[in-house]
Design a protein with these regions (language model features):
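Post-transcriptional modification and biogenesis factors for structured RNAs
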Residues: 1-287
Length: 287
């Protein structure tokens, strides 16, 4: 398929490509994405400015980088690590750093520096100073788990709505799923009692959110809503679900914007409303 035709003939791939590009730190985008027609207008995407989108003069113990080739062991390496294969990683510093691992070129890696303190002469580091930095390649989740950083998002493609559940990476799946629709219950109706407003009128047959969760799924539809996606899904159809019973595919069926006025809300607007509305609920688990 010609690059120019992807947005029209394979819109899922186009969206996957653009969203992955937007999440990637600017200093490694060229190495990982190169030139592509999908990204021709990527400069119009609002800057996400996430914690891992570090500027060259910003220090953080964690950084994202891209491998660029093999390296000699650091002169500060112990006898154990000296025998390992080393790799150069470009991570937005003046010169590449070294990690004691063999990693193929042009692979994205998360780096953890040995110290939280800025190196001497920061940010004007020499090549020798960069090579002397003690760095390890770690799991992308480490920055979040150890320091509480929001370290970006991942983009996963699914062949259908039901496949979102079937191909879920979590062994136990999602604890709770929310389908969004203008025909759903209010967000207040599903909040736990401790977070719900006193004026809430409990809706019959509406399941409340659990007090805690490991993995929460929120599903947003397109212009026509989620009903057509459920009705055309082979897995859901085999269970007898239709447009009229689409809400049964989720634990909760919620209208995020009561009295919206406009007949249609853009999906990207609904995402903002939904995440903002659920923030207090998510935060309550960490207080």
């Amino acid at each position: 398929m010609d690059e120019n035709d992807v947005p029209w003939q394979n819109p899922d791939q186009f969206l996957y490509h653009v969203m992955s590009y937007a999440e990637c730190p600017p200093h490694i985008r060229t190495d990982l994405f190169g030139q592509h027609q999908n990204l021709k207008w990527a400069g119009n995407i609002p800057s996400l400015d996430m914690p891992h989108h570090l500027k060259s003069n910003e220090w953080c113990r964690f950084r994202e980088g891209v491998t660029i080739g093999p390296a000699k062991p650091s002169h500060l390496a112990s006898r154990t690590t000296e025998k390992k294969q080393w790799t150069y990683v470009k991570c937005g510093l003046p010169y590449p750093v070294k990690v004691p691992l063999h990693i193929e070129p042009f692979m994205r890696v998360t780096l953890k520096f040995a110290t939280e303190d800025e190196p001497t002469s920061w940010p004007h580091l020499s090549e020798q100073q960069c090579e002397a930095l003690q760095v390890d390649a770690v799991a992308p989740s480490t920055a979040r788990e150890e320091e509480g950083y929001y370290w970006g998002y991942t983009v996963r493609r699914a062949t259908s709505l039901s496949d979102v559940h079937i191909s879920c990476d979590y062994p136990d799946g999602y604890d709770f799923s929310i389908g969004t629709s203008e025909r759903g219950a209010t967000l207040d109706a599903i909040l736990p009692d401790a977070l719900a407003p006193r004026s809430r009128v409990k809706a019959h047959g509406v399941e409340q959110l659990p007090p805690t969760f490991d993995h929460l799924l929120i599903v947003f539809g397109g212009v026509a809503g989620l009903e057509p996606a459920v009705a055309s899904d082979p897995e859901f159809k085999s269970k007898g679900l239709t447009k009229e019973t689409a809400h049964e595919a989720f634990d909760a069926w919620v209208n995020l914007v009561q009295g919206q006025g406009s007949r249609t809300i853009r999906t990207e607007e609904a995402v903002d409303f939904g995440l903002f509305g659920l923030k207090a609920y998510v935060d309550s688990m960490y207080k």
